[in-house]
């Protein structure tokens, strides 16, 4: 779990920025969005396959251009 410890000389804006970076790096917000609603395992598999297909198409397009 992300956390930032403040000292007396620390600026709040800087600490908030550090905290936001830690939250983003830990993936807290993306996990929260993913868990907002229940998703059936079959739907999860479909999304995972679609994402893999999309990555493959992107990779193939990049290879053909470069």
UniProtKB/Swiss-Prot annotation:
UniProtKB keywords: Ribonucleoprotein, Ribosomal protein
One MF term in the entry's GO annotations: structural constituent of ribosome
Coiled-coil blocks: none
Pfam families, per the entry: Ribosomal_S21
Keyword Ribonucleoprotein: yes
Gene Ontology biological-process annotations: translation
Alphabetized Gene3D superfamilies for the sequence: Ribosomal protein S8
A GO CC term assigned to this protein in UniProt: ribonucleoprotein complex
Record family assignment: Belongs to the bacterial ribosomal protein bS21 family.
Database matches in HAMAP family: Ribosomal_bS21
Matching PANTHER family: MITOCHONDRIAL 28S RIBOSOMAL PROTEIN S21, SMALL RIBOSOMAL SUBUNIT PROTEIN BS21
NCBIfam families hit by this protein: S21p
Name this protein carries in UniProt: Small ribosomal subunit protein bS21
Organism: Maridesulfovibrio salexigens (strain ATCC 14822 / DSM 2638 / NCIMB 8403 / VKM B-1763) (Desulfovibrio salexigens)
Lineage: Bacteria, Pseudomonadati, Thermodesulfobacteriota, Desulfovibrionia, Desulfovibrionales
GN (gene name): rpsU
């Amino acid at each position: 779990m992300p956390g930032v410890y403040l000292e007396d000389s620390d600026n709040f804006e800087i600490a908030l920025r550090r905290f936001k970076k830690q939250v983003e790096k830990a993936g807290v917000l993306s996990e929260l969005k993913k868990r907002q609603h229940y998703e059936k395992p079959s739907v999860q598999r479909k999304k995972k396959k679609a994402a893999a297909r999309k990555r493959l198409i992107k990779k193939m397009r990049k290879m053909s251009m470069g």
